Regions:
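Membrane-cytosol interface segments of multi-pass membrane proteins
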Residues: 1-217, 347-381
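Aromatic-anchored segments of alpha-helical transmembrane domains
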Residues: 20-27, 164-170, 212-226, 272-285, ...
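Structural signal for the C-terminal ends of transmembrane alpha-helices
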Residues: 83-93, 198-204, 223, 248-260, ...
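Membrane-interfacial entry segments at the cytosolic side of transmembrane helices
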Residues: 204-210, 261-271
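Alpha-helical transmembrane segments of multi-pass integral membrane proteins
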Residues: 246, 272-377
């Protein structure tokens, strides 16, 4: 087991980078004339449109780039979640004596001849409740606002149950039933927690790599058939679409720089960032390369965090990212609320006025939600 490569402040800074990309993307991509992303499916016309705006840049270029690339904050969250799981459950003893008795007999030898499901079920229940605690406050607030504002979503009973049970990702046509849209992440995370505990926990690295290769292989097969298909959409809504960054986080926690090469020189890290940015853009131009972009997104974010941490005059930016990471959970669940309030301003022509008000309000509401979520008791393992 590798010692902690990413410190707690570094993890928070990475969360800050990720949530900034996500909450800005989720505003920008709802604006009509702005370039759309290839998040669940690969659309060549979106890539062609990106190339057009890059060839003839205007004042909306930052909005175009946030719309197209901002969703890659999700793979960074998956990477960090996997990293945290390994550091928490594999790097040190974490079970109490009572919990260990569920897995071991009195003699201390591991029970054999039968599968003990109690501990995995406790693990899954614990992480489901953690996700539920984070989701429920934002979901209740959003649904009330959604009902009293124009364009409210029509929920079916099954949609609500699936949202609260976090199995909405597996239902047909997830685009039409998951509302607010970013909440698909909770079902994805629950699936990955289950996969980790049942298949990858304390297993040989070959299990992780094998599952990553299988998921990537199936995605490539779907892509060669029709990268715009509903089959591709449903596939990437579920754990298979997030297995690359999640598996990468597991391997990075265990093996460190053997998996993601970072450097101890800010200059070298800077050129590493330039290389990653160039590679991310070029890989995004075709379906095969698009499949592997999350790998380089994770590497880029780690390099950026390392660079900001090492350069003294950039320490202010690092502290801002670290603070943003500390409110990232609340910002994730609350930003659909502020988006629905402020996006009409941008849609009626003043893009940056609406965006600026959205940013200010979202951060303030996220801070308030953070204080509220602290009042909800944490689940017990």
């Amino acid at each position: 087991m590798n010692s902690a490569i990413l410190s707690r402040p570094a993890c928070n800074a990475l969360r800050g980078l990720a949530i900034i990309g996500i909450f800005l993307h989720n505003y920008c991509h709802w604006l009509g004339p702005i370039v759309k992303e290839n998040e669940y499916q690969y659309f060549q016309h979106n890539v062609d449109r990106l190339n057009q705006v890059m060839a003839s840049m205007d004042l909306n270029l930052p909005v175009h780039l946030l719309s197209f690339f901002g969703h890659y904050g999700v793979p960074v969250f998956l990477f960090l979640s996997a990293y945290g799981l390994v550091m928490k459950y594999e790097a040190k003893p974490h079970l109490s004596t009572e919990q260990q008795t569920r897995m071991y007999n009195i003699s201390g030898k591991k029970l054999t001849g039968s599968i003990n499901w109690r501990e995995p079920l406790h693990f899954i229940r614990y992480h489901y409740l953690k996700l539920f605690k984070m989701m429920i406050v934002g979901f209740v607030a959003f649904t009330m606002l959604d009902l009293i504002t124009p364009g409210s979503h029509h929920y079916a009973a099954l949609d609500i149950v699936a949202m609260l049970g976090m199995f909405n990702n597996v239902l047909p046509n997830p685009d039409n039933i998951i509302w607010p849209g970013p909440y698909w992440f909770f079902g994805l995370m629950l699936q990955l927690y289950i996969i980790y505990r049942l298949l990858l926990y304390c297993r040989h690295w070959g299990w992780t790599v094998g599952l990553m290769l299988i998921c990537i292989g199936i995605q490539l097969i779907l892509g060669f058939d029709n990268p715009e298909s509903e089959a591709m959409n449903c596939y990437r809504y579920n754990f298979m679409g997030g297995m690359l960054p999640f598996g990468l986080g597991i391997l990075y926690a265990r093996y460190g720089e053997k998996i993601l090469m970072t450097f101890h020189s800010p200059i070298t890290n800077f050129f590493g960032c330039i290389f990653c940015i160039s590679l991310i853009y070029s890989l995004s131009l075709n379906m095969i390369g698009w499949t592997f972009v999350p790998f380089f997104i994770c590497l880029l974010c780690v390099l950026v965090a390392e660079m900001l941490q090492d350069i003294r005059w950039l320490s202010g930016i690092y502290k801002v990212l670290e603070w943003m990471g500390s409110i990232s959970a609340a910002l994730f669940v609350s930003h659909p609320i502020t988006r629905k309030i402020f996006i009409p301003i941008s849609r009626h022509g003043d893009i940056y006025a609406g965006l600026l008000l959205y940013i200010i309000a979202s951060i303030c509401i996220a801070w308030l939600f953070t204080q509220l979520m602290k009042k909800i008791p944490n689940p017990k393992y």
